[in-house]
Amino acid sequence: MEQADADAFALLALIRQLGVASSAQLQAATGRSQPTLSRLLRALAAQVVVLGSGRSTRYGLPQPLLGAPAVQPLRWVMPDGRLHDWGRLTFLAGDRVHVQADGLDSLNQGSLPWFMAPLRAQGFLGRVLARQWAQRGLDANPDRWSLEQVLATALLLHDAPGALVLGEPPAGSVMPPATGTAPDLDALADEVASTLPAGSSAGGEQAKFLTHDETGHPLIVKFTPPLDTPFGERWHDLLQAEALALQVLAEWGVPVAAAQVLQTARRAYLVSRRFDRLPGGGRLHAVPLDAVHGAFVPGGRQHWGATCRELERQRRLPPGAGAQAEALLHFGRLIGNTDMHFGNLSLWVQPQEVPRGRFSGLAPVYDMLPMRWRPDMAQGLVDIEPFEPDAVALGSPAREVALQFWQQLAALPAASRALRRAAQAMALRLQRG
Protein backbone atom coordinates (compact mmCIF):
# COMPACT_ATOMS: atom_id res chain seq x y z
CA MET A 1 0.00 0.00 0.00
CA GLU A 2 1.43 3.39 -1.03
CA GLN A 3 1.89 6.01 1.66
CA ALA A 4 -0.85 8.27 0.26
CA ASP A 5 -3.31 5.38 0.29
CA ALA A 6 -2.28 4.43 3.80
CA ASP A 7 -2.74 8.03 4.98
CA ALA A 8 -6.18 8.22 3.37
CA PHE A 9 -7.23 4.90 4.90
CA ALA A 10 -6.02 6.03 8.33
CA LEU A 11 -7.88 9.34 7.99
CA LEU A 12 -11.13 7.59 7.09
CA ALA A 13 -10.75 5.28 10.08
CA LEU A 14 -10.12 8.28 12.34
CA ILE A 15 -13.20 10.17 11.12
CA ARG A 16 -15.28 7.02 11.56
CA GLN A 17 -13.98 6.68 15.12
CA LEU A 18 -14.67 10.32 16.00
CA GLY A 19 -18.02 10.48 14.20
CA VAL A 20 -17.48 14.06 13.10
CA ALA A 21 -14.29 16.07 13.44
CA SER A 22 -12.95 19.53 12.74
CA SER A 23 -9.73 20.19 10.84
CA ALA A 24 -8.01 21.10 14.11
CA GLN A 25 -9.07 17.80 15.70
CA LEU A 26 -7.80 15.83 12.71
CA GLN A 27 -4.50 17.72 12.69
CA ALA A 28 -4.01 17.06 16.39
CA ALA A 29 -4.82 13.35 16.04
CA THR A 30 -2.69 12.73 12.93
CA GLY A 31 0.15 15.18 13.43
CA ARG A 32 -0.32 16.36 9.85
CA SER A 33 -0.17 19.99 8.80
CA GLN A 34 -3.23 21.82 7.62
CA PRO A 35 -2.13 21.86 3.93
CA THR A 36 -1.39 18.12 4.02
CA LEU A 37 -4.71 17.38 5.65
CA SER A 38 -6.54 19.53 3.10
CA ARG A 39 -4.93 17.56 0.25
CA LEU A 40 -6.00 14.28 1.84
CA LEU A 41 -9.56 15.50 2.35
CA ARG A 42 -9.78 16.69 -1.26
CA ALA A 43 -8.68 13.25 -2.42
CA LEU A 44 -11.42 11.72 -0.25
CA ALA A 45 -14.16 14.08 -1.47
CA ALA A 46 -16.30 11.17 -2.66
CA GLN A 47 -16.16 9.48 0.75
CA VAL A 48 -16.11 12.41 3.19
CA VAL A 49 -18.84 15.03 3.53
CA VAL A 50 -18.21 18.61 4.62
CA LEU A 51 -20.53 19.82 7.38
CA GLY A 52 -21.05 23.47 8.19
CA SER A 53 -18.84 26.31 7.02
CA GLY A 54 -16.15 28.67 8.23
CA ARG A 55 -14.77 27.98 11.68
CA SER A 56 -17.55 25.49 12.37
CA THR A 57 -16.58 23.26 9.41
CA ARG A 58 -16.46 19.58 10.31
CA TYR A 59 -16.07 16.34 8.42
CA GLY A 60 -18.02 13.10 8.55
CA LEU A 61 -18.71 9.91 6.63
CA PRO A 62 -22.06 9.88 4.79
CA GLN A 63 -24.26 6.81 5.27
CA PRO A 64 -26.92 6.02 2.62
CA LEU A 65 -30.54 5.81 3.78
CA LEU A 66 -31.50 2.28 2.74
CA GLY A 67 -30.06 3.02 -0.69
CA ALA A 68 -31.22 6.65 -0.87
CA PRO A 69 -28.59 9.43 -0.81
CA ALA A 70 -27.26 10.37 2.62
CA VAL A 71 -27.68 14.08 1.88
CA GLN A 72 -31.29 15.22 1.55
CA PRO A 73 -33.01 18.62 1.29
CA LEU A 74 -35.25 19.76 4.12
CA ARG A 75 -38.08 21.94 2.91
CA TRP A 76 -40.64 23.96 4.84
CA VAL A 77 -44.16 24.33 3.46
CA MET A 78 -45.11 27.92 4.24
CA PRO A 79 -48.62 29.05 5.30
CA ASP A 80 -49.32 30.27 1.75
CA GLY A 81 -48.33 26.89 0.28
CA ARG A 82 -44.91 27.93 -1.04
CA LEU A 83 -42.11 25.39 -0.64
CA HIS A 84 -39.14 27.00 1.14
CA ASP A 85 -35.67 25.45 0.84
CA TRP A 86 -35.06 25.50 4.57
CA GLY A 87 -32.04 23.28 5.19
CA ARG A 88 -30.00 20.18 4.45
CA LEU A 89 -29.92 16.87 6.30
CA THR A 90 -26.95 14.49 6.21
CA PHE A 91 -27.07 10.99 7.67
CA LEU A 92 -23.64 9.98 8.95
CA ALA A 93 -21.88 6.82 10.00
CA GLY A 94 -22.28 6.17 13.70
CA ASP A 95 -26.05 6.82 13.63
CA ARG A 96 -25.63 10.59 13.49
CA VAL A 97 -27.91 13.17 11.90
CA HIS A 98 -26.58 16.58 10.89
CA VAL A 99 -28.95 19.39 9.92
CA GLN A 100 -27.74 22.69 8.54
CA ALA A 101 -30.09 25.62 8.02
CA ASP A 102 -29.93 29.39 8.33
CA GLY A 103 -28.56 29.97 11.84
CA LEU A 104 -28.68 26.25 12.66
CA ASP A 105 -25.91 23.64 12.84
CA SER A 106 -27.45 20.62 14.58
CA LEU A 107 -25.87 17.23 15.27
CA ASN A 108 -27.76 14.38 16.94
CA GLN A 109 -26.73 10.81 17.60
CA GLY A 110 -29.26 7.99 17.72
CA SER A 111 -32.36 10.18 17.41
CA LEU A 112 -34.02 12.83 15.29
CA PRO A 113 -33.54 16.49 16.21
CA TRP A 114 -36.55 17.79 18.12
CA PHE A 115 -37.97 19.83 15.25
CA MET A 116 -38.12 16.74 13.01
CA ALA A 117 -40.15 14.65 15.49
CA PRO A 118 -43.38 14.94 13.42
CA LEU A 119 -41.63 13.15 10.53
CA ARG A 120 -41.37 9.92 12.50
CA ALA A 121 -44.06 7.36 11.70
CA GLN A 122 -45.81 6.66 15.00
CA GLY A 123 -49.11 5.86 16.66
CA PHE A 124 -51.95 4.13 14.86
CA LEU A 125 -51.23 5.71 11.47
CA GLY A 126 -47.54 4.86 11.81
CA ARG A 127 -48.34 1.22 12.52
CA VAL A 128 -50.67 1.05 9.53
CA LEU A 129 -47.90 2.42 7.32
CA ALA A 130 -45.41 -0.03 8.82
CA ARG A 131 -47.64 -2.91 7.78
CA GLN A 132 -47.88 -1.49 4.27
CA TRP A 133 -44.09 -1.27 4.13
CA ALA A 134 -43.47 -4.77 5.49
CA GLN A 135 -42.23 -5.89 2.08
CA ARG A 136 -39.33 -3.46 2.52
CA GLY A 137 -38.15 -5.54 5.46
CA LEU A 138 -39.36 -3.12 8.13
CA ASP A 139 -40.63 -4.20 11.54
CA ALA A 140 -44.41 -3.95 11.92
CA ASN A 141 -43.82 -1.75 14.99
CA PRO A 142 -42.23 1.59 13.97
CA ASP A 143 -41.05 2.09 17.56
CA ARG A 144 -38.46 -0.62 16.82
CA TRP A 145 -37.10 0.97 13.66
CA SER A 146 -33.47 2.04 13.45
CA LEU A 147 -32.71 5.72 12.90
CA GLU A 148 -31.77 4.91 9.30
CA GLN A 149 -35.17 3.28 8.78
CA VAL A 150 -36.96 6.22 10.40
CA LEU A 151 -35.26 8.65 8.02
CA ALA A 152 -35.70 6.44 4.96
CA THR A 153 -39.44 6.18 5.60
CA ALA A 154 -39.63 9.92 6.29
CA LEU A 155 -38.61 10.35 2.64
CA LEU A 156 -41.99 8.77 1.79
CA LEU A 157 -44.07 10.69 4.37
CA HIS A 158 -44.91 13.83 2.43
CA ASP A 159 -48.19 14.30 4.30
CA ALA A 160 -46.69 13.88 7.76
CA PRO A 161 -47.87 16.22 10.53
CA GLY A 162 -46.31 19.67 10.49
CA ALA A 163 -44.65 21.70 7.75
CA LEU A 164 -41.28 19.97 7.22
CA VAL A 165 -40.72 17.75 4.19
CA LEU A 166 -37.62 15.57 3.86
CA GLY A 167 -36.39 14.84 0.33
CA GLU A 168 -38.10 15.61 -2.94
CA PRO A 169 -41.89 16.00 -2.60
CA PRO A 170 -43.98 14.09 -5.13
CA ALA A 171 -45.92 15.90 -7.81
CA GLY A 172 -49.64 16.27 -7.06
CA SER A 173 -51.68 15.40 -3.98
CA VAL A 174 -51.02 12.33 -1.88
CA MET A 175 -54.41 12.50 -0.17
CA PRO A 176 -57.03 9.80 -0.76
CA PRO A 177 -59.77 10.73 -3.26
CA ALA A 178 -62.65 10.37 -0.78
CA THR A 179 -64.37 13.55 0.40
CA GLY A 180 -65.49 12.47 3.86
CA THR A 181 -69.14 11.74 3.05
CA ALA A 182 -70.74 8.88 4.99
CA PRO A 183 -70.34 6.15 2.32
CA ASP A 184 -66.73 7.21 1.75
CA LEU A 185 -66.02 7.08 5.48
CA ASP A 186 -67.30 3.51 5.74
CA ALA A 187 -65.22 2.46 2.74
CA LEU A 188 -62.05 4.05 4.13
CA ALA A 189 -62.62 2.57 7.59
CA ASP A 190 -63.12 -0.89 6.09
CA GLU A 191 -59.92 -0.51 4.09
CA VAL A 192 -57.90 0.44 7.17
CA ALA A 193 -59.51 -2.26 9.33
CA SER A 194 -58.69 -4.91 6.71
CA THR A 195 -54.96 -4.24 7.13
CA LEU A 196 -55.02 -5.13 10.84
CA PRO A 197 -54.85 -8.58 12.44
CA ALA A 198 -58.17 -9.91 13.70
CA GLY A 199 -59.18 -8.16 16.94
CA SER A 200 -56.28 -5.73 16.72
CA SER A 201 -56.36 -1.96 17.01
CA ALA A 202 -52.71 -1.53 15.97
CA GLY A 203 -51.22 -1.35 19.43
CA GLY A 204 -54.25 0.01 21.26
CA GLU A 205 -54.33 3.47 19.69
CA GLN A 206 -57.64 4.83 18.45
CA ALA A 207 -58.25 3.71 14.86
CA LYS A 208 -58.08 6.58 12.37
CA PHE A 209 -57.31 7.58 8.80
CA LEU A 210 -56.59 10.69 6.72
CA THR A 211 -58.87 12.12 4.04
CA HIS A 212 -60.21 15.54 3.00
CA ASP A 213 -63.54 17.31 2.81
CA GLU A 214 -65.39 18.55 -0.26
CA THR A 215 -63.35 21.78 -0.25
CA GLY A 216 -60.09 19.85 -0.21
CA HIS A 217 -59.22 20.65 3.40
CA PRO A 218 -57.32 17.74 5.03
CA LEU A 219 -59.12 15.80 7.75
CA ILE A 220 -58.12 13.25 10.35
CA VAL A 221 -60.92 10.81 11.14
CA LYS A 222 -61.23 8.52 14.15
CA PHE A 223 -63.61 5.61 13.76
CA THR A 224 -65.26 3.04 16.00
CA PRO A 225 -65.45 -0.72 15.64
CA PRO A 226 -68.85 -1.86 14.28
CA LEU A 227 -71.62 -0.29 16.36
CA ASP A 228 -73.32 -3.63 17.01
CA THR A 229 -70.37 -4.68 19.21
CA PRO A 230 -69.63 -3.73 22.85
CA PHE A 231 -66.38 -2.01 21.86
CA GLY A 232 -68.17 -0.16 19.06
CA GLU A 233 -70.81 1.15 21.45
CA ARG A 234 -68.18 2.27 23.96
CA TRP A 235 -66.07 4.09 21.38
CA HIS A 236 -69.23 5.75 20.10
CA ASP A 237 -69.75 7.16 23.59
CA LEU A 238 -66.13 8.27 23.85
CA LEU A 239 -66.13 10.04 20.49
CA GLN A 240 -69.33 11.87 21.49
CA ALA A 241 -67.60 12.93 24.71
CA GLU A 242 -64.50 14.06 22.83
CA ALA A 243 -66.48 16.21 20.42
CA LEU A 244 -68.32 17.79 23.35
CA ALA A 245 -65.11 18.40 25.33
CA LEU A 246 -63.61 20.27 22.37
CA GLN A 247 -66.83 22.24 21.89
CA VAL A 248 -66.90 23.31 25.54
CA LEU A 249 -63.23 24.31 25.52
CA ALA A 250 -63.81 26.35 22.35
CA GLU A 251 -66.69 28.17 24.05
CA TRP A 252 -64.24 29.14 26.78
CA GLY A 253 -61.83 30.57 24.22
CA VAL A 254 -59.41 27.64 24.05
CA PRO A 255 -58.07 26.81 20.56
CA VAL A 256 -59.13 23.27 19.66
CA ALA A 257 -59.09 20.93 16.71
CA ALA A 258 -62.54 21.57 15.20
CA ALA A 259 -64.42 18.26 15.14
CA GLN A 260 -67.85 16.72 14.70
CA VAL A 261 -69.31 13.25 15.05
CA LEU A 262 -70.81 11.61 11.97
CA GLN A 263 -72.60 8.28 12.19
CA THR A 264 -73.57 5.67 9.64
CA ALA A 265 -75.53 2.49 10.17
CA ARG A 266 -72.23 0.72 10.81
CA ARG A 267 -69.79 3.03 12.58
CA ALA A 268 -69.35 6.41 14.25
CA TYR A 269 -66.67 8.86 13.16
CA LEU A 270 -65.00 11.86 14.78
CA VAL A 271 -64.10 14.06 11.81
CA SER A 272 -61.49 16.71 12.67
CA ARG A 273 -60.01 19.42 10.48
CA ARG A 274 -56.23 19.17 10.60
CA PHE A 275 -55.11 22.33 12.37
CA ASP A 276 -51.63 22.15 10.81
CA ARG A 277 -53.11 22.52 7.32
CA LEU A 278 -54.29 25.74 5.65
CA PRO A 279 -56.19 26.54 2.43
CA GLY A 280 -54.13 26.45 -0.74
CA GLY A 281 -51.79 23.75 0.52
CA GLY A 282 -50.32 25.85 3.33
CA ARG A 283 -48.99 24.23 6.48
CA LEU A 284 -48.04 25.07 10.06
CA HIS A 285 -45.47 23.27 12.19
CA ALA A 286 -46.37 21.83 15.60
CA VAL A 287 -43.94 19.69 17.59
CA PRO A 288 -45.06 17.22 20.29
CA LEU A 289 -44.20 18.28 23.83
CA ASP A 290 -42.34 14.99 24.26
CA ALA A 291 -39.64 16.00 21.75
CA VAL A 292 -39.44 19.54 23.13
CA HIS A 293 -39.02 18.30 26.71
CA GLY A 294 -36.25 15.94 25.65
CA ALA A 295 -34.36 18.76 23.95
CA PHE A 296 -34.71 21.56 26.49
CA VAL A 297 -36.01 20.43 29.89
CA PRO A 298 -33.71 18.62 32.33
CA GLY A 299 -35.08 15.71 34.34
CA GLY A 300 -38.05 13.45 33.90
CA ARG A 301 -41.48 14.23 32.53
CA GLN A 302 -43.96 15.16 35.28
CA HIS A 303 -46.93 16.63 33.42
CA TRP A 304 -47.78 19.20 30.78
CA GLY A 305 -47.91 22.11 33.20
CA ALA A 306 -44.49 21.50 34.74
CA THR A 307 -42.77 21.22 31.37
CA CYS A 308 -44.47 24.27 29.86
CA ARG A 309 -43.77 26.38 32.94
CA GLU A 310 -40.08 25.46 32.65
CA LEU A 311 -40.09 26.35 28.95
CA GLU A 312 -41.74 29.65 29.85
CA ARG A 313 -39.08 30.25 32.50
CA GLN A 314 -36.44 29.69 29.82
CA ARG A 315 -38.31 32.21 27.62
CA ARG A 316 -38.94 29.53 25.02
CA LEU A 317 -42.71 29.91 25.45
CA PRO A 318 -44.57 33.23 25.77
CA PRO A 319 -45.86 34.37 29.17
CA GLY A 320 -48.97 32.52 30.28
CA ALA A 321 -48.36 29.39 28.22
CA GLY A 322 -47.43 27.38 31.31
CA ALA A 323 -50.66 28.35 33.05
CA GLN A 324 -52.63 27.43 29.92
CA ALA A 325 -51.04 23.97 29.83
CA GLU A 326 -51.75 23.48 33.52
CA ALA A 327 -55.39 24.51 33.05
CA LEU A 328 -55.75 21.93 30.27
CA LEU A 329 -54.18 19.33 32.53
CA HIS A 330 -56.69 20.11 35.29
CA PHE A 331 -59.60 20.03 32.86
CA GLY A 332 -58.44 16.67 31.55
CA ARG A 333 -58.16 15.21 35.03
CA LEU A 334 -61.63 16.45 35.93
CA ILE A 335 -63.19 14.78 32.88
CA GLY A 336 -61.36 11.48 33.38
CA ASN A 337 -58.66 11.81 30.75
CA THR A 338 -56.04 9.32 31.93
CA ASP A 339 -54.03 9.52 28.70
CA MET A 340 -52.46 12.98 28.77
CA HIS A 341 -49.03 11.79 27.70
CA PHE A 342 -46.46 14.12 26.16
CA GLY A 343 -47.47 13.23 22.61
CA ASN A 344 -50.96 14.63 23.21
CA LEU A 345 -49.92 18.27 23.51
CA SER A 346 -47.98 20.15 20.85
CA LEU A 347 -46.29 23.54 20.48
CA TRP A 348 -46.24 25.86 17.48
CA VAL A 349 -42.85 26.79 16.05
CA GLN A 350 -41.97 29.13 13.18
CA PRO A 351 -39.09 28.29 10.80
CA GLN A 352 -37.01 31.29 11.89
CA GLU A 353 -37.39 30.30 15.56
CA VAL A 354 -36.08 26.72 15.24
CA PRO A 355 -32.39 27.75 15.68
CA ARG A 356 -33.34 29.57 18.91
CA GLY A 357 -35.60 26.82 20.20
CA ARG A 358 -38.49 29.23 20.75
CA PHE A 359 -42.19 28.49 20.38
CA SER A 360 -45.11 30.77 19.65
CA GLY A 361 -47.57 28.95 21.90
CA LEU A 362 -49.68 25.86 22.45
CA ALA A 363 -51.20 24.20 19.41
CA PRO A 364 -54.96 23.48 19.44
CA VAL A 365 -56.18 20.83 21.87
CA TYR A 366 -56.77 17.31 20.58
CA ASP A 367 -57.37 13.82 22.05
CA MET A 368 -59.22 15.29 25.06
CA LEU A 369 -61.79 12.75 26.31
CA PRO A 370 -62.58 10.46 29.31
CA MET A 371 -59.99 7.81 28.44
CA ARG A 372 -60.48 6.10 31.82
CA TRP A 373 -63.45 4.34 30.17
CA ARG A 374 -61.55 3.25 27.07
CA PRO A 375 -62.08 -0.43 26.23
CA ASP A 376 -58.99 -2.57 26.58
CA MET A 377 -58.15 -5.56 24.39
CA ALA A 378 -56.78 -7.47 27.39
CA GLN A 379 -59.15 -6.34 30.15
CA GLY A 380 -62.30 -5.81 28.08
CA LEU A 381 -64.83 -3.13 29.00
CA VAL A 382 -64.60 -1.23 32.25
CA ASP A 383 -67.88 -0.06 33.75
CA ILE A 384 -68.79 3.58 33.21
CA GLU A 385 -68.87 4.70 36.83
CA PRO A 386 -68.32 8.13 38.41
CA PHE A 387 -64.90 8.73 39.93
CA GLU A 388 -63.41 10.91 42.63
CA PRO A 389 -62.21 14.21 41.10
CA ASP A 390 -58.57 15.19 41.49
CA ALA A 391 -58.37 17.48 44.54
CA VAL A 392 -55.88 19.94 43.03
CA ALA A 393 -57.80 20.19 39.76
CA LEU A 394 -61.03 20.63 41.72
CA GLY A 395 -59.64 23.80 43.25
CA SER A 396 -58.59 25.25 39.89
CA PRO A 397 -60.49 27.48 37.43
CA ALA A 398 -60.87 24.42 35.19
CA ARG A 399 -63.58 23.16 37.54
CA GLU A 400 -66.22 25.45 36.04
CA VAL A 401 -65.33 24.35 32.50
CA ALA A 402 -65.42 20.67 33.45
CA LEU A 403 -68.75 21.18 35.21
CA GLN A 404 -70.22 22.55 31.99
CA PHE A 405 -68.87 19.50 30.14
CA TRP A 406 -70.48 17.03 32.53
CA GLN A 407 -73.79 18.88 32.61
CA GLN A 408 -74.03 18.96 28.83
CA LEU A 409 -72.91 15.34 28.50
CA ALA A 410 -75.62 14.30 30.96
CA ALA A 411 -78.20 15.84 28.60
CA LEU A 412 -76.67 14.61 25.34
CA PRO A 413 -79.22 12.41 23.51
CA ALA A 414 -76.52 10.65 21.47
CA ALA A 415 -74.76 9.36 24.61
CA SER A 416 -75.70 6.04 26.17
CA ARG A 417 -77.83 5.90 29.30
CA ALA A 418 -74.84 4.67 31.32
CA LEU A 419 -72.69 7.59 30.18
CA ARG A 420 -75.44 10.14 30.86
CA ARG A 421 -75.94 8.74 34.39
CA ALA A 422 -72.22 8.89 35.14
CA ALA A 423 -72.03 12.42 33.73
CA GLN A 424 -74.89 13.54 35.95
CA ALA A 425 -73.17 12.07 39.00
CA MET A 426 -69.88 13.77 38.05
CA ALA A 427 -71.64 17.11 37.66
CA LEU A 428 -73.02 16.77 41.19
CA ARG A 429 -69.58 15.90 42.56
CA LEU A 430 -68.00 18.93 40.92
CA GLN A 431 -70.80 21.16 42.20
CA ARG A 432 -70.27 19.90 45.75
CA GLY A 433 -66.53 20.27 45.48
Residue ranges with predicted function:
Residues 1-433:
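Phosphate/dinucleotide-binding and metal-coordinating scaffold of catalytic cores
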